[in-house]
């Protein structure tokens, strides 16, 4: 089986650069599994985990929106924000989740921007999921 050159980049810089046998990502149209030789595509990403099947097992990256470009043997992910599993501070993520839940509750009561509160909650849950997947 061949391999893919994978790059995950945010406005703050690169988060992951390496080789993977498969990339699994959730797009707005559903989950995609990318193998070497995949047809070229560009797809918007949902707030979710990008799973990288690598020689040593699997790496998880919490990606908060963005786009995935597949071209030949390359997968480039341009994410709004992204964190590798080992870089996530679980205490900070849990506190962010709690703040987002409180903000969502307040938003529903006060009819303020519920969408932003829901996005903050999704991002916090995504980070926690990436950190605790094992």
From Swiss-Prot:
Q: Does the keyword 4Fe-4S apply?
A: no
Positions of transmembrane segments: none
**Primary localisation category:** membrane
Q: Gene3D superfamilies from the entry?
A: ATP synthase delta/epsilon subunit, C-terminal domain, F0F1 ATP synthase delta/epsilon subunit, N-terminal
Establish whether keyword Flavoprotein is in the entry: no
| Membrane topology listed for this record | Peripheral membrane protein
Annotated Gene Ontology cellular components are: plasma membrane; proton-transporting ATP synthase complex
| Record-linked InterPro entries | ATP_F1_dsu/esu_C_sf (IPR036794), ATP_synth_F1_dsu/esu (IPR001469), ATP_synth_F1_dsu/esu_N (IPR020546), ATP_synth_F1_esu_C (IPR020547), ATPsynth_dsu/esu_N (IPR036771)
Which UniProt keywords are listed?
ATP synthesis, Cell membrane, CF(1), Hydrogen ion transport, Ion transport, Membrane, Transport
* Compartment(s): Cell membrane
**What GO molecular functions are on record for this protein?**
ATP binding; proton-transporting ATP synthase activity, rotational mechanism
What is the superkingdom listed in this entry's lineage? Bacteria
Q: What is this protein's function per UniProt?
A: Produces ATP from ADP in the presence of a proton gradient across the membrane.
Family per record = Belongs to the ATPase epsilon chain family.
State the oligomer form and interacting partners.
F-type ATPases have 2 components, CF(1) - the catalytic core - and CF(0) - the membrane proton channel. CF(1) has five subunits: alpha(3), beta(3), gamma(1), delta(1), epsilon(1). CF(0) has three main subunits: a, b and c.
Q: NCBIfam families this protein is in?
A: ATP_synt_epsi (TIGR01216), PRK00571.1-3 (NF001846), PRK13442.1 (NF009977)
Protein name, per record? ATP synthase epsilon chain
Biological source species: Listeria monocytogenes serotype 4a (strain HCC23)
Upper lineage ranks? Answer: Bacteria, Bacillati, Bacillota, Bacilli, Bacillales
Q: Which gene encodes it?
A: atpC
